Swiss-Prot record:
Keywords: Ribonucleoprotein, Ribosomal protein, RNA-binding, rRNA-binding. This is Large ribosomal subunit protein uL14. One of its GO terms (molecular function) is large ribosomal subunit rRNA binding. Belongs to the universal ribosomal protein uL14 family. PANTHER family: 50S/60S RIBOSOMAL PROTEIN L14/L23, LARGE RIBOSOMAL SUBUNIT PROTEIN UL14M. Part of the 50S ribosomal subunit. Forms a cluster with proteins L3 and L19. In the 70S ribosome, L14 and L19 interact and together make contacts with the 16S rRNA in bridges B5 and B8. Binds to 23S rRNA. Forms part of two intersubunit bridges in the 70S ribosome. SUPFAM superfamilies: Ribosomal protein L14. Pfam families: Ribosomal_L14 (PF00238).
Length: 122
């Protein structure tokens, strides 16, 4: 459950370490984003010589949340932290690798690239 001002870790090798949600996309009054939702983020911490710089604004897809996601069989998958993968304007991943597990809920037409790059799909 991600809202404005939430800080997230970055689960790819784009060069960003920490990002902050500045907008939840998808409707003017939408408050929260979950796994698989697209948010607008600002880079708060970046590594030197990375693809992205501190202060830049990107789209991102949420891949892990502490709140987790509920499956139809009643099980809940939760994670230790919130994480996102940075996207460009065409909603393609900026990084070439994805770190850590992602959930099966990302298996839509838009995010198959992230699923294929991830080391583990839960």
């Amino acid at each position: 459950m991600i809202q404005m001002q939430t800080t997230l870790g970055v689960a790819d090798n784009s060069g960003a370490r920490q990002v902050q949600c500045i907008k939840v996309l998808g409707g003017s009054r939408r408050r929260y984003a979950g796994i698989g939702d697209i948010i607008k983020v600002s880079v708060k911490d970046a590594i030197p010589r990375g693809r992205v710089k501190k202060g830049e604004v990107y789209n991102a897809v949420v891949v892990r949340t502490r709140r987790g996601v509920r499956r139809p069989d009643g099980s809940v998958i939760r994670f230790d932290g919130n994480a996102a993968v940075l996207l460009n304007n065409q909603l393609q991943p900026i990084g070439t690798r994805v770190f850590g597990p992602v959930t099966r809920e990302l298996r839509s037409e838009k995010f198959m690239r992230i699923i294929s790059l991830a080391p583990e799909v839960l």
